[in-house]
Amino acid sequence: EPIITVRAPAVQAQLVETYLLLCINHQTLIATKANRIVRAAQGRAVSEFGSRRAHGADAAILGARAAGIGGCSGTACTITDQLFGFNATGTMAHSWVQMFDSELEAFKTYCKCYPNGTVLLVDTYNVLKSGVPNAIKAFDEVLKPMGCRPVGIRIDSGDITYLSKKARKMLDEAGYPDCKICASNALDEYLIRDMIYQGAKVDMFGVGERLITAKSEPVFGGVYKLAAVEDDDGNIQPKIKISENVAKITTPHFKKLYRIYDKDNHKAVADLLCVHDEVIDESRPLTLFDPQFTWKKKVITNFEAKPIQQQIFKDGKCVYKKPAYENIVKYAAAEIDTLWDEITRFENPHTYYVDLSQKLWEVKNYLLAENNRQTAD
């Protein structure tokens, strides 16, 4: 979960609220959706193809960036490559094929333009009767004499599972077993999972609208809440927002977040929210408990408590060295690997717990009790 602590004069802290939520909510949402799709692909490459369906230019550019962090191997948004170094990739358009007098002529011309990166779109007219046969002819007549091999073909419509099986057989028989098949057309993690289960002969997926808009879950509900006030003497006064909905009761105080790892397998056990000055002693057993159902407890030993947050600004100056984009991608992948499969599965996943330390839980309950007392008075 994203967590940011802003400690600033009240007016300044309020001014950054909207922009922080805009950036964090949107890109966290897209990165999460991308990661689900990538995991569904089971090692097959996934490219982000969604710019045309994004909700504005910034959503396309930053959404593509987030998709890469989530695990996509490329994007059709070229400016994202220019700005962040995320690999730009893509294939031909249907309009390219339509502009020529014949599909074969369109394919042969494209092969001449991109002999080392040829991916032909074979569904403009008929995948099996013209698209794949003409692609094979173009490979034979243009690429083969040049000593080049095709990268692949793309199928963008129809029963892709069925068509990919037939296309794979045709390509193999023509001497192109290394020619990859890319599938696109309103895909998401569920469709990709089903296609693979049904035996689709697909090597790559181009995922557009359902990724760039996170169609299945289009809102990420991150919030920005006042947690404490510091007076002129430096005393911190925890603040709480109370709601009839238990889930919307905020957790007070300036906080520090630890991620607790099991040293035996380096799997994440839970996250632990603490008061900002708390230090976890790794030499002693640690009791984790559900902050709402406190009788649910777990005592762990042989663990590592890793502080998650890093300071970005201090006294108005940036003190953080921004990591290279590829390092952000690697970090995200490594953290996902620390989660149990039961947590990352699509149906009925286990809850990943964010617990409170005993000290923070006591602060929260004190403020709740104090509010009840004042209300009763």
What are these regions (language model features)?
Residues 169-174, 179, 187-377:
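Gly/Ser/Thr/Ala-enriched C-terminal appendages of enzymes
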